[in-house]
Amino acid sequence: MKIDFSMGLVEAEAAEKASSMMSYSDQAEHRLREFCAARLAHSELPQIEKTILFARSLKSENAAHPSVRAYFSHPVRVATLALRLETVPSAEIVQLGLLHNVFEVSGLNESNLLKEGYSRRTAEGIRLLTVDRRRQYDPVYLEAFHRKIETHGEDLALIRCVDRLDNLLAFQLIERTKVIEDYLDLTIRFVVPMASRLSPQFGAYLLKLIAYMREVGCDRQLKERYESFLKEAVETAV
């Protein structure tokens, strides 16, 4: 797989990510639909629309993501960026991006996706992308986890790396703890090499982003604004 890696300045991308976390996904969805219309075959667009509606309609079973409505801009951003980076665009990469975290967030499994009409390869890919949170800081587990993703295909590796990129862009909203430092160290150990195999520029950008986030730390004002937005989103959904 060839990718055309291009991102803005780390500071600008982080600011855009923070803004997306304090608004619902409408604008991000509109951008994804426009991008799909420009890059994919017209016949593929109904399946993309179906996936957007399906993923957005799911209920959260995960306390870390109490509001799917507030969270949904993340998978939309992952899908958009993955499609943007692919030299040869595919509808499957968009589906993988939109669905990449549905097992963890909603409690679905492979059979649920198969019943919805998704391919066995897509359903298996989502399973492989779903990390066992009990072992997420275990290097032995992570070695096998990332190897299976790359064995499945470079498209799945791209989703893994773009997912991590989008998560890292939000780190100004997160308090610094040993767990966070471990997360950054393990990203350097496992995700950066994977990204570098897709594109040397991708790996270098991740390293630059990690260095930036370590330098600026947590912006408490941004964090408080995000927590206020999330609280409102949860209360509105009740």
Please state what every model-predicted region is.
Residues K2-V238:
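Active-site helical microenvironments for divalent-metal-assisted chemistry
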